[in-house]
From Swiss-Prot:
Residues 49-139 form the ATP-cone domain. Belongs to the NrdR family. Keywords: ATP-binding, DNA-binding, Metal-binding, Nucleotide-binding, Repressor, Transcription, Transcription regulation, Zinc, Zinc-finger. This is Transcriptional repressor NrdR. It holds the Pfam family ATP-cone. Transmembrane segments: none annotated. A zinc finger (unnamed) spans 3-34. One of its GO terms (biological process) is negative regulation of DNA-templated transcription. It comes from Trichodesmium erythraeum (strain IMS101). The lineage of its organism: Bacteria, Bacillati, Cyanobacteriota, Cyanophyceae, Oscillatoriophycideae. InterPro entries: ATP-cone_dom (IPR005144), NrdR-like_N (IPR055173), RNR_NrdR-like (IPR003796).
Length: 175
């Protein structure tokens, strides 16, 4: 490692420790030439993810832009910003796990919506209204119905014992 004082490349590591929640290693070094002590960091180099927008334009993934949009949709819901930062970090990890250099904004929007539905229904509706470009009340109603159906399906699956036979019967009533 190059010494910042004398530019010598000969140094020794005095101490190493994990930093930034395990995403980097902090090393304390000493130059063998001038005995100057300095700190270096080793970080994982993530894939550069390119977002393909609806209009076909491409831009680099901007974690802070995603966070701003999610914070806006979660205003006055009582969700802490630190929780939202962790939420965005999870999304970034998921995107990195796909090992794709390019991903559509639609894919990211769907990932966000699937995760928001478990956190806040209000935030889900707000995010969906911007992401899906709602044109009127019908779009809100359709999304609310979809969210309600998802919730009912989850509740139904949670009450059904595993490995049991289920017989569903539909009653039709003519009025």
């Amino acid at each position: 490692m190059l010494c910042p004082i004398c530019q010598d490349t000969n140094s020794r590591v005095l101490e190493s420790r994990s930093a930034e929640s395990g995403k980097s290693i902090r090393r304390r070094r000493e130059c063998m030439n001038c005995q100057h002590r300095f700190t270096t960091y080793e970080r994982i180099e993530f894939l550069t993810i390119t977002i393909i927008k609806r209009d076909g334009k491409k831009e680099s993934f901007d974690k802070s832009k995603l966070l701003r949009g999610i914070i806006r949709s979660c205003e006055k819901t009582g969700i802490e910003v630190s929780q939202l930062e962790a939420f965005v970090n999870q999304i970034e990890v998921e995107l990195q796990g796909k090992c794709q250099r390019e991903i559509t904004s639609a894919e990211i929007g769907e990932i966000v919506l699937s995760k928001l539905s478990g956190i806040s229904e209000v935030a889900y509706i707000r995010f969906a209204s911007v992401y899906r470009k709602f044109q009127g009340i019908r779009d809100f109603v359709d999304t609310l119905n979809h969210l309600q159906n998802q919730k009912e399906n989850l509740e139904f699956t949670a009450t059904v014992p595993q490995n049991s036979e289920i017989s569903l019967q539909q009653d039709v009533i003519n009025v």
